[in-house]
Design a protein with these regions (language model features):
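Rossmann-like dinucleotide-binding cores of NAD(P)H-dependent redox enzymes
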Residues: 205, 209-240, 244, 299, ...
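Ferredoxin-type iron-sulfur electron-transfer modules and their immediate structural context
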Residues: 1-176, 227, 269-286, 361, ...
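Rossmann-like dinucleotide/flavin-binding elements
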Residues: 182-206, 246-256, 275-277, 294-350, ...
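Short beta-strand to alpha-helix junction loop
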Residues: 138-146, 220-232, 246, 250-257, ...
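A conserved short coil-to-beta-strand element within the FAD-binding core of flavoproteins
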Residues: 246-262, 366-378, 387-390
Length: 490
């Protein structure tokens, strides 16, 4: 039949439309188009009308001299792109690789992912899943399992006889000869190296530990992401020409100035936040008290294989959940988490919290540590007081306690996972780079450049504690800025 002469007309229910595009694909007459005004969970976006050039008097009020720093005045609409892509810090073309995977084009899907993310297999296991939070399908029933799809695509590549190695972007296929040093082989540093390699550089990554990986190897338990997966992803970087110099601490074994003398033109500092925050309460010096990050390092290295007795974990974030789950696997005793926040206020991702509960971790809300108790230099228990509120009316961290309501819990181990602090050593010695708050390295928010022109920063030491996907995005931005710095005009 001739579809254009059909007596039937299409009927749509706007309340059920999720902008999946299926009607566009199947309409035999090609009469349906999917425009840029995508719907959201709150309904279609209403765009304001723009002034027309011939109706505008172009005075100073229509000219923004500082447009690079205030580009919010430029009327670009993130909602014109798939919400999942907008929500992803790395801006991966999620809607694209899902479609390719649906068509069985797994190799093409992987190539699309790796344009923006060098570690899809790792992220498939530990990603924050901002994309699923924004998925429009969630307004109908539940979001697509985007992370699982990405993980499946990456697994196909890992099973392949020949791994996919991204090609260099250079039109001339000639490498840039400028030497770039990256300090820190965590997700941000390796991401920067990856995108510089794609651009045509041969970056050198300096890592003080014995192997690259940073928190992916040392800080995240192997039951969340296998170390073989991390190492497999790192091997691809080596094939791309990235050089790793492990066991070298910049600032101690070699300085930035010495590296300059060796011909390095730019530096990307991504050393993370390596020091566990302390409680600063009585008894913290007792044997059996350990920082959560130090505990995870010890577990991942194989130095700690078991714990004796009951364990108390202080903290309510994802790191605290990791610590508690790791401890549960090493002790025959109980593992209890105590945090300041109420259940609905906990900063941990719900999926991670549920995984901890499934493992047998008991979460106790609205309690703050008051003192760690001990005998003969060893932990015997902990005294806690009720936490009434965590933040003030302005949302600032300002916990309020009721010291009249306390409990004492016996235990043999106290693991503290309440945050991370900086431990830069002498990595910035001899440079103008600063840490004004004693924690993060000051930098330009767009270029990640410090007060020392050839020194750039990224990852947690620039932004504060965030997720792996945020570090990956930070590494890419750093690579772009470094490329423009060493090749003026690019």
């Amino acid at each position: 039949p001739n579809p254009s002469a059909s007596a039937y007309t299409a009927e749509t229910d706007p309340e059920k439309c999720v902008a999946c595009g299926k009607c566009v694909e199947t309409c035999p007459a090609g009469a349906v188009r999917l425009g840029q005004k995508l719907c959201t969970k709150e309904g279609p976006i209403q765009y304001p009308r723009h002034e027309l050039p011939d109706d505008t008097k172009w005075g100073e009020d229509h000219w923004n001299k500082n447009y690079r720093n205030e580009n919010g005045s430029i009327q670009t609409w993130p909602t014109g792109t798939a919400p999942c892509k907008v929500a992803c810090p790395a801006h991966i073309a999620i809607q694209g690789y899902i479609k390719m995977a649906a068509d069985g084009r797994y190799a093409d899907a992987l190539k699309l992912i790796k344009k923006d993310n060098p570690f899809p297999a790792v992220c498939g296991s530990i990603c924050r899943k901002y994309c699923e939070d924004a998925c429009t399908r969630g307004s109908v029933d539940q979001p697509l399992a985007i992370d699982e799809i990405k993980k499946f695509i990456a697994e196909q590549d890992m099973k392949a006889e020949h791994r996919y190695v991204p090609a260099m972007n250079s039109c001339t296929h000639e490498k840039f000869d400028q030497k770039i040093a990256i300090i820190g082989a965590g997700p941000a540093g390796m991401s920067c190296a990856y995108f510089l390699a794609i651009e045509g550089y041969s970056p050198v990554v300096f890592e003080k530990e014995a192997a690259p990986g940073g928190m992916l190897i040392n800080g995240i338990p192997s039951f969340r992401v296998g170390k073989d997966i991390v190492k497999s992803e790192i091997d691809v970087l080596r094939e791309m020409g990235v050089e790793f110099r492990c066991g070298v601490e910049v600032g101690k074994d070699v300085t930035i100035q010495q590296l300059r003398e060796e011909g390095f033109r730019a530096f990307y500092v991504a050393v993370g936040l390596q020091k566990a925050a302390k409680l600063n309460i009585p008894g913290e010096e007792l044997a059996g008290v350990q920082g959560g990050l130090d505990f995870l390092r010890s577990v991942n290295s194989g130095a700690t294989k078991e714990l004796s007795g009951d364990v108390i974990v202080i903290g309510g974030g994802n790191a605290a959940i990791d610590v508690a789950r790791a401890a549960k696997r090493l002790t025959g005793g109980s593992v209890n988490m105590y945090c300041l926040e109420k259940d609905e206020e906990m900063p941990t991702v719900p999926d991670e919290k549920n995984a901890g509960i499934a493992d047998g971790v008991v979460i106790n809300n609205s309690w703050a540590p008051k003192a760690i108790l001990g005998e003969d230099g060893k932990v015997t228990g902990i005294e806690l007081m009720r936490c009434v509120s965590v933040r003030d009316a302005n949302g600032k961290f300002a916990p309020v306690y009721d010291e009249n309501e306390t409990i004492t819990v016996p235990c043999s181990n106290v693991l503290v996972a309440i945050g991370q602090r900086s431990e830069y050593g002498a990595v910035l010695a001899g440079t103008a780079a600063e840490t004004p708050d004693g924690r993060l390295i000051a930098h330009d928010v767009i270029t990640f450049q410090t007060a020392e022109p050839d020194v750039f920063v990224g990852g947690d030491c620039a932004t504060g504690p965030k997720y792996t996907i945020d570090a990956i995005a930070s590494g890419r931005e750093g690579a772009v800025s470094i490329h423009r710095y060493v090749n003026v005009g690019q």
